[in-house]
Amino acid sequence: MMQDDTGIDRDTKSTKQDKKVKNWNTTILIVLIIVLIASMANLSIFIGGMQTLDNIKLRYEESTRTERIKHLIDEVDNLYNEYYTGELDYDKIEKMVINGYIIGAEDRYGMYLSGKDTTDYYNKINDRLVGIGVEVVYEDESLYVTDVYKDSPADNSGINVGDKIKSIENENVSELGLQGAVDKIKGEQGTRVNISLDNRDLTIERDLVTTSNIRYDIINDIGYIKIKCFTAGTDGLFKDIMNELQNKGIDKFIFDLRGNGGGLLDSVVETLDYLLPKGLIVRIEDRNGTITEFNSDRKYVEGEMVVIVNNETASAAELFTLALMDYNKATVIGTNTYGKGTSTTTIPLSIGSVNISTNLYYTKSGTNIEGVGIKPDIVLEYKSDVPLYRAKYSEDNQLQKALELLDK
C-alpha cells in the first residue's frame, strides 16, 4: 500500500480508521500545547536568568579589580565544591591560581614558590642544600652527573662527573623524567636513597651539603675560573681565588660563564667591584622611575681577561659580562647570551613566596639587554663530540680559543 508524506493511506478508510486519525490529531494538538507551555516556561526562566546575570555584571563592574578576582575565584571554588565529580587537589589549585595570575600579568620571569620550594631556593643562594650533593642533566631518558660537590655523600660514595644514573628507588629514570627523578633524589637529612648507576648500585644517606658555584684551575699559566651562579658566597670565594692566582704570578684570566643563569645582584656587584676601576657598575630602575646606582671603588685587577658565554648565560652573568665590556677589560667569546635585562625580587607570602620582576638594569654604557642579549666580540659555536659538561679542556673549542687569545 502506497503512502504519501502525510503518513495517511491513499485508499478509502473505514470509519474506525477515521476515528483513529481524529484521536491521533487530538493527541498531536495536546502535545504541541504542552511543548508551547514548556517553551514559554523555559523562556521565562532564561529571561529571569539574564536579569540575574545583569545584576551580577553590574556589581562586578562596580567592584575593584582585586575584589573582582577574589569574587570570581570564590564563585568558581563554590561551584566546583558543589558540582564537580572529581577530587580537588588544593595544593595544586593554589599553585596554579597564582601562576595563572603571573601569566596574566605577562611577567616573563615571575614565579610562585611553595613553602618547600622557597626553603630550597634560599638554601641554594646561601650555598647549601640537603641531598646527596650532585648536579645532573637529563639526556636520552637518563640522568648524567655534571658535578659532584666536594666531601658530599655522593663524593664519599665514589660518584663521578659523567656517571649515568639509571634508576632511583627501583624506578627507571626514563619513566620518572627529569623532575620526577630529581624529586626522588631529594629528601630529608638522614634518610637514605637507593641509586643504580651503569656499573653499580649505591645506598646513600642524604645530608646537609655545602655547595660551591665556582671552581678554578691554572692552564698554561692562565687562570681559569668557572662561575656557575652568583650566590651569597660567590664574591668572597672569587676574591680569594683571584688573590691566590695573582700571588702565583698569574695575570691572565678566563671567566667561564656558560650555563650561568644569574644569581644575586649584590654578589655580582661585589665581584665586579673587585675587577673594575672607579665608576658606575650598574643602575637599576623600578616601576616608579626610582634609580639606584652601584659603583666600584678605585682598586681593581690589572691583567688580560676573556669571558666565555653562551645562550644560557643570563641576568647577573650578563651584567658581569657587559660591565667588563663597557670598561674594555675583557674580550668576550661564544654565542649570543640569553637577554635578561631585569632583576627579580623574591617576596614572602603567607605560604611560600613569589618572584616578581621589579627592576630594569642599565650598565655604564646605558645598555639594557632585555630580549636582546649580548653579542660576543668573537662569535664561536661550541663544537665537540661530547657534551660541554664532560668535555676535557682539549675538547672544548671555545676554551681553546680563549687560551689562544691570551697566549699571544
Task: Annotate each language-model stretch with its function.
Residues 2-111, 141, 247:
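Terminal targeting/pro-maturation regions of precursor/exported proteins
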Residues 76, 97, 101, 134, ...:
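Terminal peptide-recognition signature
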Residues 80-144, 192-203, 211-216:
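Extended, small/polar residue-biased N-terminal targeting/export presequences
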Residues 127-168:
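Glycine-rich active-site/cofactor-binding loop and its immediate structural neighborhood
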Residues 139, 148-149, 168-169, 226-230, ...:
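Active-site-proximal beta-strand/loop segments in catalytic clefts of secreted hydrolases
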Residues 154-177, 253-256, 332:
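Conserved PDZ fold ligand-binding element
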Residues 169-251, 370-394, 398-400, 404:
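C-terminal, low-ordered peptide segments at domain boundaries
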Residues 202, 210-214, 240, 261-315, ...:
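Gly/Ser/Thr-rich loop/hinge elements
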